[in-house]
Amino acid sequence: MAQKAPMTVTFVTGNQNKLKEVRAILGEEHADKFTLEARKVDLPELQGEPEDIAKEKVMLAARQIDGPTLVEDTSLCYNALQGLPGPYVKWFLDKLGHEGLNKMLAGYDDKSAYAQCVFAYVDGPNGEPKVFVGTTDGKIVPARGPTDFGWDPVFQPDGFEETYAEMDKAVKNGISHRYRALDKFREFILAEAAGR
């Protein structure tokens, strides 16, 4: 009996750093079961709760891809600001920079925050989206480390003395909000691939 070709999942991103990190977290050991290919798809910027945004984004993308589709929505949530900037952190970072993200908490004693990653997957344009959420608690600190990957320099996860940006990639990829969400996705997609 011939072995089935691996299931191909299209990850919607134009961010090469994110793609590299997602591939590193998912690993190559399951390449015979599923493969991840990246595709940049223009999607509208949606507003709402992170899980709702991810579900809507994956359905919009699946209509263009017409096959198994994966999207990600990441949030950085300040507890003192009741979760802001949340899913809008990209826009806050673009306008304020790392220093501005830090200064948002200048008037607050509470510097605690959490990083949240929401992946949404659907098997095609008529499917029902599935959501996988990962969260890492930490705090907002003055920017430290390389500044080439989003807000990583200002987020220091609980239990560590380094920001995400300062961490060895293997350490970050084993504790991050993205890892926690992808770990759930990996378990799901392996079961899906086995059932084909």
From Swiss-Prot:
Its EC number is 3.6.1.66. It is an enzyme of class 3 (hydrolase). Keywords: Cytoplasm, Hydrolase, Magnesium, Manganese, Metal-binding, Nucleotide metabolism, Nucleotide-binding. GO terms for molecular function: dITP diphosphatase activity; ITP diphosphatase activity; metal ion binding; nucleotide binding; XTP diphosphatase activity. One of its GO terms (cellular component) is cytoplasm. It is found in: Cytoplasm. Its cofactor is Mg(2+); Mn(2+). CDD domains: HAM1. GO terms for biological process: deoxyribonucleoside triphosphate catabolic process; nucleotide metabolic process. ITP binds at residues 13-18, 57, 73-74, 90, 149-152, 172, 177-178. Its main location: cytoplasm. It catalyses: ITP + H2O = IMP + diphosphate + H(+); dITP + H2O = dIMP + diphosphate + H(+); XTP + H2O = XMP + diphosphate + H(+). Mg(2+) binds at E45. Binds 1 divalent metal cation per subunit; can use either Mg(2+) or Mn(2+). Belongs to the HAM1 NTPase family. PANTHER family: INOSINE TRIPHOSPHATE PYROPHOSPHATASE, INOSINE TRIPHOSPHATE PYROPHOSPHATASE/HAM1 PROTEIN. Pyrophosphatase that hydrolyzes non-canonical purine nucleotides such as inosine triphosphate (ITP), deoxyinosine triphosphate (dITP) or xanthosine 5'-triphosphate (XTP) to their respective monophosphate derivatives. The enzyme does not distinguish between the deoxy- and ribose forms. Probably excludes non-canonical purines from RNA and DNA precursor pools, thus preventing their incorporation into RNA and DNA and avoiding chromosomal lesions. Homodimer. This is Inosine triphosphate pyrophosphatase. It comes from Micromonas commoda (strain RCC299 / NOUM17 / CCMP2709) (Picoplanktonic green alga).
